C-alpha cells in the first residue's frame, strides 16, 4: 500500500511539474506576442534640475528673439495628431534626435553659453531613449516627423532658429510623454 501511495505521489508531482512548465511556456509565448514599447521612459529627475531647466529655457528664449516667423509652430497639436498616448515618447525621441543632429549641431556656435550646456543634456536624454522602439504601426509618427523636418528645411536657417526657439516646448513635451 505504501509503495502504491509513493508511486501515485511521484506521478502526481510529475503531472504538476509538467503542468507548471506548460503554463510558463504559454505565458512566455503570449508575452512575446504583445506589442511592447521598449524603454520609452525617462526619469523625472532629468526634468527637475533647476540649472539645466533654466539654461534650456534661456536658450529657447534667446533664439525666439531672433525668430521672425510667428506663423509657424513646430511642436504643437499637429505633431501629435494620430499618435496614441503610449507612442508619444517614441515620437518625441524622433523629434529630439532630429533637433540634435540637424539643428543644434549645425548651429552649435550660436547662442552661447547656453548651447554648450544644453546640447550635452539633450544628448544624454537621447542616449537614454536609444532603446525606445515601438513594435506597432508607426506610420502617423513618421508622417508627422517628416512634416516637421520638411518645414524646418523649407524655412532654412530661419527654421533652425525656430526649432531652437521651441526647445522649451521640446523639453516640456519630452517630460509629458516620457516620464
Swiss-Prot record:
InterPro entries, per database record: 4_helix_cytokine-like_core (IPR009079), IL-10_CS (IPR020423), IL-22 (IPR020453)
Keywords: Cytokine, Disulfide bond, Glycoprotein, Secreted, Signal
Residues carrying covalently attached carbohydrate according to the record: 54, 68, 97
Pfam families named in the record: IL22
Disulfide-linked positions: 40-132, 89-178
Annotated SUPFAM superfamilies: 4-helical cytokines (SSF47266)
GO CC term (a single one): extracellular space
GO biological process entries: negative regulation of inflammatory response; positive regulation of transcription by RNA polymerase II; reactive oxygen species metabolic process
Molecular function via GO: cytokine activity
UniProt subcellular location: Secreted
Disruption phenotype: Deletion mice have an enhanced response to agricultural dust as evidenced by an exacerbated increase in infiltrating immune cells and lung pathology as compared to wild-type controls. In addition, T-gondii-infected mice display a significant defect of the epithelial barrier and an increase in macromolecular permeability when compared to wild-type mice.
Signal peptide: 1-33
Biological role stated in the UniProt entry: Cytokine that plays a critical role in modulating tissue responses during inflammation. Plays an essential role in the regeneration of epithelial cells to maintain barrier function after injury and for the prevention of further tissue damage. Unlike most of the cytokines, has no effect on immune cells. Signals through a heterodimeric receptor composed of two subunits, the specific receptor IL22RA1 which is present on non-immune cells in many organs and the shared subunit IL10RB.
Family statement drawn from the similarity comment of this UniProt entry: Belongs to the IL-10 family.
Protein known as: Interleukin-22
Organism of provenance: Mus musculus
Gene field: Il22
Amino acid at each position: 500500500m505504501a509503495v502504491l501511495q509513493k508511486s501515485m505521489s511521484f506521478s502526481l508531482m510529475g503531472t504538476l511539474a509538467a503542468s507548471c512548465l506548460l503554463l510558463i511556456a504559454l505565458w512566455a509565448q503570449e508575452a512575446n506576442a504583445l506589442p511592447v514599447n521598449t524603454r520609452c521612459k525617462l526619469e523625472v529627475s532629468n526634468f527637475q534640475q533647476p540649472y539645466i531647466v533654466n539654461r534650456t529655457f534661456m536658450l529657447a528664449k534667446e533664439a525666439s528673439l531672433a525668430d521672425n516667423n510667428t506663423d509657424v509652430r513646430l511642436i504643437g497639436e499637429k505633431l501629435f495628431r494620430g499618435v496614441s498616448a503610449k507612442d508619444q515618447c517614441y515620437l518625441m525621441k524622433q523629434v529630439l534626435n532630429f533637433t540634435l543632429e540637424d539643428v543644434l549641431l549645425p548651429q552649435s556656435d550660436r547662442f552661447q553659453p547656453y548651447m554648450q550646456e544644453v546640447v550635452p543634456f539633450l544628448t544624454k536624454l537621447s542616449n537614454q531613449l536609444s532603446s525606445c522602439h515601438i513594435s506597432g504601426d508607426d506610420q502617423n509618427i513618421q508622417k508627422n516627423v517628416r512634416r516637421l523636418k520638411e518645414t524646418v528645411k523649407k524655412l532654412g536657417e530661419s527654421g533652425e532658429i525656430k526649432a531652437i526657439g521651441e526647445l522649451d516646448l521640446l523639453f516640456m513635451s519630452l517630460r509629458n510623454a516620457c516620464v
